[in-house]
């Protein structure tokens, strides 16, 4: 069969499989590609191709992730599947694979298990907005009442972590039987993809979000003003727009963008992904510095106190060799700069070991533009010892 051309006209969505070890995440991923391949919507991937995912490095952290792509009638999907539990934790915290929605795989024969709970909690903390459930291995359970019981358990668990447990689609199927080509079970994969299509909304594109650009460098051009350079993280900025300079200083300042330059050419506007120089009126060279952001006024605010879901690197990953304790004071690297912060451990936690995944409370010594979902690295003397994502802002 001839390879299909990548169809840009379909909206793109990032999803992934989550759930307890051996409940069938990878088998389901293989089954989705195999069933969709029959419609010409995917390249069929065997279990082994997905399971043997190569290791990648994201912010100094080693993660194994398999990436597959496929499409439905309505959309194009990029799908991530991780071999090990630790890979999920790292993946979700570093945002190496940002998910617009997830397929939670639960074995009907076992019901929800510890990692089922952990992955739901992680999804809540790092901001995976939507979950669809695939109850797998239903061919192994003859008792209809037992299936209903497991479904109720899953729904209750989702509700416990503030997902709409009563409304979430739950599809009962068998990934293995679908993979083996049994028509009744293949239909369940179609049903799952219809649920994913309709229940997980198409995400807002980065260019449609409010403008933000982390400042990387600043210099002045005599007679013209101050230029701040950086990569536009989201939204767009036009010549004449008023933007706010946020972070590091106590007070945010409003300035006007009088010019936008890229590759030494003048532009009318710039958008997410562009590396630009923004010419600013009404601000001196010393009033703006690396680590601040330019943003649409009112869209993001500076904070010093927050809670964060973090992963602490192991010794093998180049992290610490020893645990850290309450009042640990590392550097927190947000976007383009390091800021010292003081760590408070959760009640009842004496220390944090390399390899741990934990929610920390942090107080920065200077305010930084952050919001729920902002990613950062934890560093000591320039080397990365952890990664985190803001889960709750307190001040």
UniProtKB/Swiss-Prot annotation:
Phosphorylated on serine and/or threonine residue(s). Dephosphorylated by stp. Its main location: cytoplasm. One of its GO terms (cellular component) is cytosol. Mg(2+) binds at residue 26. It comes from the Bacteria. Keywords: Cytoplasm, Elongation factor, GTP-binding, Hydrolase, Magnesium, Metal-binding, Nucleotide-binding, Phosphoprotein, Protein biosynthesis. The keyword Mitochondrion does not apply. PROSITE patterns: G_TR_1 (PS00301), G_TR_2 (PS51722). Residues 10-204 form the tr-type G domain. Residues 60-64 are annotated as: G2. It holds the Pfam family GTP_EFTU_D3. Its EC number is 3.6.5.3. Residues 136-139 are annotated as: G4. SUPFAM superfamilies: EF-Tu/eEF-1alpha/eIF2-gamma C-terminal domain, P-loop containing nucleoside triphosphate hydrolases, Translation proteins. Residues 19-26 are annotated as: G1. It catalyses: GTP + H2O = GDP + phosphate + H(+). GTP binds at residues 19-26, 81-85, 136-139. Residues 81-84 are annotated as: G3. Residues 174-176 are annotated as: G5. It is found in: Cytoplasm. GTP hydrolase that promotes the GTP-dependent binding of aminoacyl-tRNA to the A-site of ribosomes during protein biosynthesis. Belongs to the TRAFAC class translation factor GTPase superfamily. Classic translation factor GTPase family. EF-Tu/EF-1A subfamily. Monomer. This is Elongation factor Tu.
